[in-house]
Amino acid sequence: MDINKQKTKWDISIFKNENFTLPVIKSPFNTYYNKYIDSVINDIEEWHRECCFLGREKLKGYIESKPYLFSAYYYCHLNEKVLPFIIKFVDMFSIYDDEYLEKTNCSEDVINQFLDKNYKDKNIYGVEWFKIVEGLKKYGNKQSVNKFLKEFEFFIKNVHSIHLKENANYTNINFEEYTNTRSIDFGFDLVVSAAIIDCEEPSKEIRESSLFLTLNTKSSIICVLVNDIYSFVKESKQPDTMNYVKIMANKKKSIQKALNHTNKIINNTLKEIISIENQIKMQYKENNLYQYIERLNSVISATIYLHQNHKRYSVHNKNYINKNN
């Protein structure tokens, strides 16, 4: 097949003669591990056994994969009271996303049980979700919990429609359109809202400022492109173009050039983020802003660290990492 005719689909066989290595992205921010994880993890594992979302056969392997590590790094600053409920949310909903939302036959009923507390046909996911909500409301910051719930509703209503469009042609949409769509799919705003759920948001004036909005947009770009790079090997066998490395490989006729191009965008965007953070901290003297930036940076750093080190990604990428990068 002629790569110049490859417009709407991805075909890895076109690049079968090309060797490539994944870049090792370096975070400019510190990576932290939540100090309360070890004290709650036994209770979380027991909760999994009681709920048995995946069935008995898959449960052992799931627990052995240490899914709690995502919460340990993404939500490294959360206090010990709210943390268990966020871990439950992350674990349960990642399973739900894989088992239901990514399936093209996912119905509205599957989604509605998370949005209507009185929905009569709730399964174990819906039942546990509202228990989690009660815990978050009890121990989280009221304003931030409400923000999280709004982001969750937006995410669950939109992410399935994105999955349904995965076979659409993303090759010809512009960078902003692509990253905006993938930011929803990644759940960036939801992840950040969970990271600050036990503290107050910055003031409305700050949240509506162009600097703050740009900071969040740039940060979401990092998370999206890091995910695209370290998911590429696994996703390379699928025909869709919902991965920026695939899009650029089709355009540049080279996987390595696409990876290098994407890595360059990441590095340049990280520099822009640092500059924006310095500007916004000079303009606004507010402790809630400083705390928000600290947690936003931890989300970025966790994204980079986990995509390079967690088994979910490393099992596919171990033969493609460029250690000398």
From Swiss-Prot:
Q: Which GO molecular function entries does the Swiss-Prot or TrEMBL record give?
A: lyase activity; metal ion binding
Motif DDxx(x)D/E motif: chain residues: 97-102
The UniProt catalytic activity note for this protein reads: (2E,6E)-farnesyl diphosphate = (E)-beta-farnesene + diphosphate; (2E,6E)-farnesyl diphosphate = (3E,6E)-alpha-farnesene + diphosphate; geranylgeranyl diphosphate + H2O = (S)-(+)-nephthenol + diphosphate
A Pfam cross-reference name: Terpene_syn_C_2
The superkingdom of the source organism is: Eukaryota
> What residue intervals hold the motif NDxxSxxxD/E motif?
227-235
**Transmembrane intervals:** none
The text the record gives for the protein's domains is:
Contains several highly conserved motifs that are important for catalytic activity including the aspartate-rich 'DDxx(x)D/E' motif and the 'NDxxSxxxD/E' motif, both of which are involved in complexing metal ions to coordinate the binding of the isoprenyl diphosphate substrate in the active site.
User: What is the stated purpose of this protein?
Assistant: Terpene synthase that converts its substrate farnesyl diphosphate (FPP) into the sesquiterpenes (E)-beta-farnesene and (E,E)-alpha-farnesene. TPS11 also converts geranylgeranyl diphosphate (GGPP) into the diterpene (S)-nephthenol.
What is the name of this protein?
Terpene synthase 11
Organism for this UniProt entry: Dictyostelium purpureum
